[in-house]
Swiss-Prot record:
It comes from the Eukaryota. Residues 654-767 form the FAD-binding FR-type domain. Pfam families: Cyt-b5, FAD_binding_6, Mo-co_dimer, NAD_binding_1, Oxidored_molyb. Residues 57-71 have a biased composition (Acidic residues). It catalyses: nitrite + NAD(+) + H2O = nitrate + NADH + H(+). This is Nitrate reductase [NADH]. Residues 538-613 form the Cytochrome b5 heme-binding domain. Nitrate reductase is a key enzyme involved in the first step of nitrate assimilation in plants, fungi and bacteria. Its EC number is 1.7.1.1.
Amino acid sequence: MAASVEPRQPFGRLDAPATAPTARAPGSNGIRRRADSPVRGCGFPSLISPPRKGPVAEEEEDDDDEDDEGHEDWREAYGSHLQLEVEPSTRDPRDEGTADAWIERNPSLIRLTGKHPLNCEPPLARLMHHGFITPAPLHYVRNHGAVPRGDWATWTVEVTGLVRRPARLTMDELANGFPAAEVPATLVCAGNRRKEQNMVQQTVGFNWGAAGVSTSVWRGARLRDVLLRCGVMSKKGQALNVCFEGAEDLPGGGGSKYGTSVSREWAMDPSRDIILPYAQNGEPLLPDHGYPVRVLIPGCIGGRMVKWVRRIVVTTAESDNYYHFKDNRVLPSHVDAELANAEAWWYRPEYIINELNTNCVITTPGHDEILPINAFTTQRAYTIKGYAYSGGGKKITRVEVTLDGGESWMLCTLDIPEKPNKYGRYWCWCFWSVEIEVLDLLGAKEVAVRTWDQTHNTQPEKLIWNLMGMMNNCWFKIKVNVCRPHKGEIGLVFEHPTQPGNQTGGWMARQKHLETAEAAAPGLKRSTSTPFMNTAGDKQFTMSEVRKHGSKESAWIVVHGHVYDCTAFLKDHPGGADSILINAGSDCTEEFDAIHSDKAKALLDTYRIGELITTGTGYNSDNSVHGGSSLSHLAPIREATKVAGAPIALSSPREKVPCRLVDKKELSHDVRLFRFALPSSDQVLGLPVGKHIFVCATIDGKLCMRAYTPTSMVDEIGQFELLVKVYFRDEHPKFPNGGLMTQYLESLQVGSSYIDVKGPLGHVEYTGRGNFVINGKQRRARRLAMICGGSGITPMYQVIQAVLRDQPEDETEMHLVYANRSEDDILLRDELDRWAAEYPDRLKVWYVIDQVKRPEDGWKFSVGFVTEDILRAHVPEGGDDTLALACGPPPMIKFAISPNLEKMKYDMANSFISF
């Protein structure tokens, strides 16, 4: 079997128009299945026509079995083929003003080196969501500078040096003049998991997390065929190395291209499947991945695979390029930057990295994932999952997990979708899983994993630091801590070692902060930051101190380097205590700015108690979507009503969940019903009745967050719906720019656009049959007075839906007064009217509108404002068994609802809830 397959049937040609694209178009939804694809579970369209049969060049080596591959039925060999799920690409505002502003990129990629150049990795959960093949827009990126603008029609690759027939090959010649090889290969940056090393001691490299790894099917001409066509000389002719040079202009060494080399022996070895790919996953290469052509050396580190390749030079000596020597080395642990330069350690050949080492990572549970411990979860095993890979074509043969620090090991189940090439080499990652009894996890402090390959190489237990932070492959360990995800219950929260880039979170980062704080505290006497007007807070706090205050008993936050104690404000916060508690103990600068007005920002100064100590380590910013790591003090997280066994998407209120837009319906000129798919089709959203979610998006370069209540059933599997009234630009004189988020949602493309959601949020939960939990306290009501305006109907709708689904057991009476501008603006009217007619003893509905647009229809409800008379006529009077729920514009609540309910004997402190 072969991982590099010569086509055996007529294929379509890759179109090379007169003006070839400089950027790849969005991925096609119509990917055809290929019977000869060398990977189970994926299929790609063919890109080229096979050339005429005949020798590629003057053969200098016997390879009689060169053409004996590819005869079997690939459908039978690899099973059913799957379509790739589309990942969107768009112009990223973060690229504005840079040389890469023309490139479309996936917005979910985590940037590791600021705006430019792009170095990024996908979110680990998103990477694993796609399984064996990584969509090209989600593939990790390592760029040293600006991306060259490639043009298929004019691009050439020069082959020169110790060859008898130097050539300058066009892209058409590469694509149509050589047999095509299709090679599935996992690419890994040598710095994968580097941040773990940086937590011990800073290296010279940036913070790669555990997702600097991706897998694609690459298609291109074999390097061996190209060199033979050009008459590569033999070793006797001193042809010992093959050098590659890219097109980008870089600063290294005073100015150079990116270049490196491999031995001639490697380049001519047919078993190594080295190719010059021009396609990835059945599409032309993306600009970030080397369009129009690059080098692929399977089983090797990414740093050897030159992108935008322009020159291939056969030489006697290895490459003398600056990046060949000053990058991709594993130096001994005692060698620091000064010693490496002084004693020329960079040039010692024994420290160069070529083949990947053995490595594996735990991906499930995710960082900050919470496993509730209850009667349901303890009756079934919990599945731990991850990926593993090795280099040099070696097969992964074993993965083991330990719960006791290596005293005993459990063998994992391997999932190896790839078949070896005909030389027995494996170029791709595999996946592993193991089922653990929940009670065993309850007694564990950490979970560690290690892997073995076919040469019985395995991973060291402890991290081995090196100057460049390369090839980190110690046991991957996650910590297991007890928390309280539900009032009266306990749960387990899992903590990964780090989070990528400058995101905080992770047990190694927490340990680093503690050590730094202890060392720095005696010497840090005064703050150097600019004080706010409130000068009372002169104290300084470390981030580790802030993290201790993550509960409703003590809720601290950090905004723009200042520390605030918001405990006293929890009960008065308009968005409810949960909105503060999900960020308590963390730096929430970005999220605070995204949803608060200048007035709110000024109000915040009242609660300032001091400033955050910065120690120069660069890890004090807490913009991670996961928040801090002291999760034993999390606010109560209630389990949603759900189908037994269905996993919850909103497993942590601190974590953003990417959701794809799968349907959009226009209910009126400005009302839309959006349907979003959850990351996994077997998940439920996990939103309790009465709670809401934050929808998060980056708009014009800034984070925007808005609260929404889904209108779909709380136990709907795989997706959820949002009913949204779109506020368009120039429609209302008070808001000439319209609604920022609603217009953004309106612009999303069905099938390819994503939003992030987080939650559950809110201080109210309806637990059924008249029972509520309000700010953590139980409250029972037999009658509900529901008053709302506009889109404020959605939380009411959610409660109504829950009550009516539980008939006849739920005897709660609901009296709804719903205000809008006109009869055309009433949302969900058909459903409300139908329910009111079907359940007259449970639901009564009364509408109030500002103006009647169609008097001929015979409007029978109120016109004008919500008044005391209207409320007295259509909602019950206050009492111990009555609860008022309100949701609408602040003026409506302040002037129309609150004072009139107070006149109707409502206890506004205990019997009135504003969503």
